[in-house]
């Protein structure tokens, strides 16, 4: 790991060169991209499913479709203001910029 004041390391420069040579790329992100915005991930130490294992049930389509209590609990959480004050972070903005420049072929999250 290099100190940020030293500039990008060799691995970062090599990755940037590969992306530039590709023209456009597919990007795969997970919930972790949003943690800097204050949105918890799922399996991390403060993750949604780590702190509330029952919440994982809402992610299973078979359970979600057949259990009205799971659906109700999920909608209560979603409507409870958990998104208030949340703003895109530098990672989100970088992906938007990358897309606007034509470098993003596909984004899967």
Model-based region annotation:
Residues 1-109:
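Conserved catalytic core of sirtuin-type NAD+-dependent deacylases
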């Amino acid at each position: 790991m290099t100190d940020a004041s030293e500039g990008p390391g060799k691995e970062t420069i090599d990755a940037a060169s590969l992306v530039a040579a590709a023209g456009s790329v597919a990007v795969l992100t997970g919930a972790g991209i949003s943690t800097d915005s204050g949105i918890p991930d799922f399996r991390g130490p403060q993750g949604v499913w780590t702190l509330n294992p029952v919440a994982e049930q809402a992610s299973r389509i078979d359970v979600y479709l057949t259990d009205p209590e799971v659906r109700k609990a999920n909608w209560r959480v979603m409507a409870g203001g958990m998104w208030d004050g949340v703003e895109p972070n530098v990672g989100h903005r970088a992906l938007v910029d990358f897309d606007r420049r034509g470098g993003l072929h596909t984004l899967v999250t």
